[in-house]
Amino acid sequence: MVKKNFIPSVSLVRRDLPTLVTTTTSSTALSKPTSSVVSETSSKSLPSLTSSAFSTSSGATSSSSLIVASITPPSTAGNPFILNAADKPNGTVYIAVGAVIGAIFISILIWWLVSSYLSRRFTMTNSYANDSKNLYRGHHKHSSSLQSNPFDINDEKSYMQDDWDSMSQLESSQYEDAASPFNPIQDPFTDNRRSLFISPTLQVSQYEKSHSRHQSKDTNIFIDDPFLYVGTYLEEEEEEEEERKLNLNRPQRAASPERKEKKINSMEGYHKRNQSSLGLIPVASATSNTSSPKKAHKRQAPSMFLDDVLNGREII
């Protein structure tokens, strides 16, 4: 038995396409949207799709009204509590604040300018004074350009004092040998010293003599200047007062000879109070009498002194 390929038979049935049906509805009142409605129609058992749309021809309108009140400021006429700003420009407060700040800045600027000018003037006058002092030292007549300055008299006095100091140093350097300027007491024989003995009194006297000699020469040179003469006179008076205080010119004895007399007088008064005759004896005889028994009496050993006490020879 031979098998054959079996081919099934298929019957094709023709189907029609679905039909689309559209319907429109209109209404005069408020319309609400309607959803599309799908209806099934049977046409040879095929579904059909139906859609509907809506359209509005008119709608309802509503109206509303809002009432707003108008605000009017009070009148300034006759009201003392309201500033009448009709006469004032706009921004009066800002203008006033700016004017105050500007006045403060202007005052600070003026103060800075004045202070800088005064300081510069002061430095210029000082520098001019120093230059004139260095250039015209030794001359007592300076230029008259500073006569308007109220400190001219003091400046002249200071110049005179400086000139006096410089000239005195020059004179002292002429008469003095090589000496240290830091030590006022100088010994001219320091290099040739052979002994180690130093006499402060001799050094002070030598210094006073040299100082008085130089001072007399300086006063003879500058005797025509009254200011310098008065200054030297005052310096001499101060030195004399210092010498009186120190008493360097008068030699003092180491021991006063009056001490023995005072001692004798005190001893006499003491013996008179005690009613003894020792005060009538001269001091030399009294000392000799008191020292003689000490010399005659020999020093004994402690054991011998104890034996004498026990034997009754000595009384404690």
Curated annotation (Swiss-Prot):
Q: Which UniProt keywords apply?
A: Membrane, Phosphoprotein, Transmembrane, Transmembrane helix, Vacuole
Region Disordered: which residues?
32-60, 240-304
**Disulphide-bonded residues:** none
Biased composition regions of type Basic and acidic residues, renumbered to the chain: 256-271
GO CC, sorted alphabetically, is: cellular bud neck; endoplasmic reticulum; fungal-type vacuole; vacuolar membrane
Please give the start and end residues of each transmembrane region. Answer: 93-113
Q: How does it sit in the membrane?
A: Single-pass membrane protein
State where the protein is found.
Vacuole membrane
Q: Which residues carry this modification: Phosphoserine?
A: S148, S256, S276
Q: What family name appears in the similarity comment? A: Belongs to the PRM5 family.
Q: What name goes with this protein?
A: Vacuolar membrane protein YNL058C
Q: What's the source species for this entry?
A: Saccharomyces cerevisiae (strain ATCC 204508 / S288c) (Baker's yeast)
User: Organism classification, top ranks?
Assistant: Eukaryota, Fungi, Dikarya, Ascomycota, Saccharomycotina
